[in-house]
Structure formats: structure tokens, C-alpha cells
């Protein structure tokens, strides 16, 4: 933006001077115009304009008028208005109150609470740093990655952890699988493959509003396992399609006409996104984080991609099939039929042209990656190696370049902050703090005489609805997943059942509010849904999902032998 502004400034200045000298230098003006029309300035030239002083070597200096002549016409002119005060600069650095509160949590635990029996001073000190880090994730005195880095620094400076121990999780296979998955998502957006797939479903199923919703839902479920970012799917593929269809039906954002079509499609896609993400291990970054944290507590799931899909398949598919219909009754659109939608989709597909070479490469690469994720254990190929093979193919064949990877800030940010949390969580386990906490929770639950199924339901509900306090699914996982899994295990809940149920809930609570996930902010920001409706429908659909997953999932997981 700065370069563009400076370029506009220089262009304006040039045109002013040229108009002044046109009478004297017509040939040079023509030369300048011809040069400008032939080669518009590139990004590099714009940047050079932003740092180089403006000079016009083809133009003679403007002759200076005498002070007497210049002042004459201004004698009767009104005085110039006083300059407007410059806006005060925005505050830099950490937010003071969240900073104080976040640090206070750790200081109080470290110095005001005595070290309990069964915990070493080193473990207690690490717990205080960890809790300050978690508090910072919630209160946000700084961006998540920056705050996690400060927590990492504190653990090393206080000699709580050695440098190698503090950075141990940066070599985690799961974390690097997450990073690479962000690059796959960029490939879907860059090639336009995701947009094309969704548009085909609109063409096939879009004759009615309900059919349109099912077409979008099924296309997201198809794309999800190879595009592990709900935010990228929402903002890069489905929201543009929904907005285009809505506007063509006369449904405008921030307008009474929004209820014609846009409001329903937004809510349906938003509520279905959680089930699409819960269906596949690689459909959302937080899924992989959950399994890594479970592994830190000794809960290891063999053949994770297949095990995850088998356990999620029945309840997730039923929810995906029911959600558009339920919302069609609870939050009905004013427009029931959309006969023009298939035509719009067909026109868009025609404009997109035939499937490009890069799209075919993307299809082949993702089919290879998903196949290796499914069969990797049999072939001896870890999931992260399968992802590395896929990314290497995309780089070699030019579908992605390294600048694409470098510009994917969310990937590198996740690597930084989650590696810190995973490393701290692992060291807390090694130092016996997690075992001590589990024993304490077990004693409390035993005193309440709760059976493990009752404790399971209570803890799952608490984990779900506490998300009203969070603005990030991955932040929620980092803050509470390990603690709640430890409580489940202490209450006698089978470890794999507890870990998977918590992970599935992590996807489902992403549709609770307008701030509960990245896709929530994307869809709410479109302007088609009023805030009270977001909260009301979020709570109602959360309850319905809990019933579907609780009832269907209970029998399905029993059939699969998870308990």
C-alpha cells in the first residue's frame, strides 16, 4: 500500500509538471506517454519509487516568481485552515493489563503456593511458566507465537529446562505434518482446484436452496482430507461461491434481503464445517495436535488416519446429512428454489476453462498423499514422510514455489508456538507433574462416586462449553486438551476413547460463536448473519451435535471396541 501511494503521488506530481511544461516540451511529453503506455511499472519499480527521491530529468526547473508577484493574489484570500492534528500513534508492544495478569498467574503459583508433596521444585517452576504461557494464549498480551517464545525463553533463563529440552518438540513429526498441511491448502487455493470442485457440486445439486446447501457440504467433505485448514476452505473457496450465488438471488449482506438465501447458506456451511473437519484426521490442523498431546500422555493410536476415520465416520456422516435439513427448518431461507444456480455455476466453469496442468498435478499429488496416509503403516512410511513427498512433488513441478511456502505465515507461527507448548507438556510429564495432577483428579472423582461413563459425559461437556472463553481451536487444545485427557484417564475412561472424543469435540465447538474459530470469523464477517442468530443457532446446533455424536457415537464406538 505504501508503494502504491507513493507511486500515485509521483504520478500526480509528474502530471502537474508536465501540464506546466507541455507548451515548451511537447515531444518529451509524448515520449513519456508512449513509455508509460508501453510498460506499466512493475512491483520492483514501485518499490524503487518509494525509496528514491522524485526527480524529472527531462523537465527544466519551474521558473521562480518574485515574492511580490506571488504574494499579490493572496492578499484577499482567506487564511488557510489550521492543520489537522496528526493521529496519535497506536501503542506498541504488549498490552499492559493482559501482560500483568498473565505473568501474575505464574508468579503466584511459583512463590505463593508451596510445592506440594510428590512434585519437584523444577517441575513446579515449569508448571508456573507453563500456566503463564497458557494465560497469555487466552488474554493475548502479544501474538501467540511471540508470547510462546517468551515463555520458552523464561524456561531457559531460569534454568528450568536446558536449551535442548526446551526445543525438543521442534523436531516433532506431527508438528511438521501440520506445517506441510498448510502448504497443501495453499496449493488448493492457488491452482483453483478447490473452487472448481465446489462449483461442480453447485452445478449438479443447486436447483433448490436445500440441494445447493448439500452440494456445498459434500464438496467440503470431499476436499477436507487434503486441505487441512477450515479457515482456508471457508475464505478461499466456499465464501466467494456463497456470496456470488446470494447476490445473484438478490440476497445482500447487511440488508433485510440477507435472509433470502445468504444467511441460510452461510449458517449451513458454517455448522457443517465442524463435522467435515471431525471426519478426517488431516481435515484440520488441531486434529494432529490432539493426537500429539495424547501421545505425550501415553495414549498412542495405531494407524491413526484409518482409526480416526473409522471412529468418526458414522456420527460425522449422519450429522453432515442432518445439519442442512435441520437448519432449513430452524432458520429457513426465504428463497426455496434456485433454478439459476446451476447456470451460474456452468458459466463460471466455462470461464475457468479446462482443468489446468497444475490442477491435475494437485489431484495426483493429493491422491498419492492420502493413499500413503492410509497405507503408510503397512508400507513403513510415516505420515509426515508422505506429506514431505507430496510437497516435494509440488515444488519440483512448479505448482508451489518456495515463496509460497515462506509466505504461509500461519504455518510457521503454528510451528513456533505449538512446538513450545508440546515441549513444555512433554517435560511436565517427564517431571511427574501430570501424574501428580491425575492422582489429585482421581481422588476428587472417587469422592463423588462417579462411574467412568458419568465422568466421561461431565468432562466432555465441560471441555466443549468452556470454549465460549476461547477464540481459537488450537489455542483451546494447547491450553486444556492435556489436562482434560489426564482427568479422563484418572476417572477410568479408556484412553483412546477419551482422546478421540475430545479431539472430535475440538472441531464441533468451532461453530459456537462468531469468534470460536477461524472459519467463524470468516463467515460472520460476510455480513449475512446477525450476531444474536450466531449465538442462538450455535448453541442449538451444538446441542443437536452432542445428541447425535453422544447417541450414535456411543453405540458405534462400542461396536468398534473402543470400550
From Swiss-Prot:
GO BP terms, alphabetized: ammonia assimilation cycle; L-glutamate transmembrane transport; malate transmembrane transport; oxaloacetate transport; response to nematode
Main location: plastid
GO molecular function, one term: oxaloacetate transmembrane transporter activity
Membrane topology reported for the UniProt record: Multi-pass membrane protein
Cellular component aspect of the GO annotation: chloroplast; chloroplast envelope; chloroplast inner membrane; chloroplast thylakoid; plastid
Keyword vocabulary terms for this entry: Chloroplast, Membrane, Plastid, Plastid inner membrane, Transit peptide, Transmembrane, Transmembrane helix, Transport
Ranges of Low complexity composition bias in the record: 28-45
Tissue expression as described in the entry: Expressed in roots, rosette and cauline leaves, stems, flowers and siliques.
Organelle transit peptide: 1-68
Chain segments annotated as transmembrane: 96-116, 134-154, 165-185, 234-254, 261-281, 308-328, 358-378, 379-399, 414-434, 450-470, 483-503, 537-557
Keyword Transcription: no
Record's compositionally biased regions (Pro residues): 76-90
Positions of the UniProt region annotated as Disordered: 16-45, 71-92
Disrupted-gene phenotype: Non-viable seedlings under normal atmospheric conditions, but grow normally under non-photorespiratory conditions high CO(2) conditions.
UniProt-listed InterPro entries: CitT-rel, SLC13A/DASS
Family of this protein: Belongs to the SLC13A/DASS transporter (TC 2.A.47) family. DIT1 subfamily.
Biological role stated in the UniProt entry: Glutamate/malate translocator involved with DIT1 in primary ammonia assimilation and in the re-assimilation of ammonia generated by the photorespiratory pathway. Exports the end product of ammonia assimilation, glutamate, from plastids to the cytosol. The precursor for ammonia assimilation, 2-oxoglutarate, is imported from the cytosol by DIT1.
UniProt-recorded name of the protein: Dicarboxylate transporter 2.1, chloroplastic
Lineage of the organism: Eukaryota, Viridiplantae, Streptophyta, Embryophyta, Tracheophyta
